[in-house]
A protein has these predicted regions:
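Mid-domain Rossmann-like dinucleotide-binding core that forms the NAD(H)/NADP(H) cofactor-binding site
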Residues: 116-191
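Short amphipathic alpha-helix with an adjacent loop that forms part of the alpha/beta core around
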Residues: 193-202
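C-terminal hydrophobic helical "lid"/dimerization subdomain
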Residues: 1, 267-321
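Glycine-rich beta-strand-centered segment in the early N-terminal region that forms part
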Residues: 22-40, 49-90
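Short glycine-centered segments of the SAM/dcSAM-binding site in methyltransferase folds
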Residues: 82, 140, 164, 227-228, ...
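NAD(P)H dinucleotide-binding glycine-rich loop of Rossmann-like/cofactor-binding domains
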Residues: 46, 82-145
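Glycine-rich phosphate-binding loop and adjacent beta-alpha segment
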Residues: 214-286, 319-321
């Protein structure tokens, strides 16, 4: 089958090459999917660069989310079913396998190619904003990187859950995009201090942060008493100085998580919760995947280069069939 390999094991976007590799064979409890489209995510870039190796037993091929047609079924899935699925790897290919419990039906009337942009982002937002961050109706969420794939999904899911959203983005155009996606307040991080904006509205309850570094102390200031700071990445630096007394005084919770290394049972639990709560939001149009641009599979290198530039709003995709 056609797949994308990293020439030399690591490198820049130009290291991504089309290759012929054996088609995967599903084990017991797994399904085989004929891939129509795959999402491109930051962890794919980190893996390509050699910083984020796949967990034990996961395919070396990039790709953490796909949508397509079931070829070999298991559990509730039968050949011909249209699904989107969370993968431990292997999505940049014509065929992929996954635990049958990590696949979900295409919600509503979404096109299969758009549904491929759901699993990684929706699972991440649900686990971090709603479980670790415990965002409740009436509370306020601050989302950094608001026009990223994670950001646009976090805005929509928080609004669907009855929360307010303060979104930060770089530049006035992206700030406007965040407002159009439903954010109540948008902060241009290039010209405004988001912690000042947050304090002016009484603080925020949850911060979803993928930046780290210089944002850390500002996040502490932005949070109101009892607030929760949730990290999902540290693109701006992973080491910070912790103001312990301030954290104690404000009774803050500092947490974070990754998705890919979680066990199969934990991912199955997340999938069930996502289908129960989030899938109805998508079916009724409250939440939708925002696709910025799609590239053919063979142009995976161009897709990575585009994502790294940071000009996108929403998801970058690969079309396979």
């Amino acid at each position: 089958m056609r797949a994308i390999a990293v020439e030399g094991g690591r490198g820049g976007p130009e290291a991504l090459r089309s290759a012929e590799i054996p088609s995967p064979t599903p084990d017991e409890g797994q399904i085989l999917i004929s891939v129509a489209a795959a999402g491109v995510n930051r962890p794919d870039i980190l893996q390509r660069q050699g910083y984020y190796p796949p967990p034990p037993g996961a395919p070396a091929t990039l790709g953490l989310e796909v949508a397509g047609e079931v070829v070999q079924g298991s559990g509730r899935w039968r050949p011909g079913d249209a699904v989107c699925a969370l993968l431990p790897g292997g999505g940049y290919a014509e065929y992929a396998v996954c635990d049958s419990r990590h696949a979900l039906p295409i919600p509503g009337d979404l096109e299969v190619s758009s549904a491929a942009g759901l699993p990684e982002t929706v699972f991440t937002v649900w686990a971090n904003v709603f479980e670790h961050g415990a965002l409740a109706p009436g509370e306020t969420l601050m989302v950094h990187g608001a026009t990223s794939g994670i950001g646009v999904m976090a805005i929509q899911m928080a609004k669907a859950a009855g929360a307010r959203v303060v979104a930060t983005a770089r530049g006035p155009a992206k700030a406007r995009e965040a407002l159009e996606l439903g954010a109540d307040v948008a902060v241009d991080a290039e010209t405004q201090d988001f912690e000042t904006v947050a304090k002016d509205i009484g603080g925020v309850d949850v911060v979803l942060d993928m930046v780290g570094g210089s944002y850390f102390l500002k996040n502490i200031e932005a949070l109101r008493t009892g607030g929760r700071l949730v990290w999902i990445s540290a693109l701006g630096g992973g080491t910070v100085e912790l103001p312990i007394v301030k954290v104690m005084q404000k009774r803050l919770v500092l947490t974070g998580s990754t998705l890919r290394p979680r066990g199969a049972d934990e991912k199955a639990r997340l999938a069930a919760e996502v289908e129960r709560v989030v899938w109805p939001w998508i079916a009724t149009g409250k939440v939708r995947p925002i696709i910025d641009r799609a590239f053919p599979l063979e142009r995976a290198g161009d897709a990575h280069a585009y994502l790294e530039k940071g000009a996108h709003v929403g998801k970058v995709m690969l079309t396979v069939k």
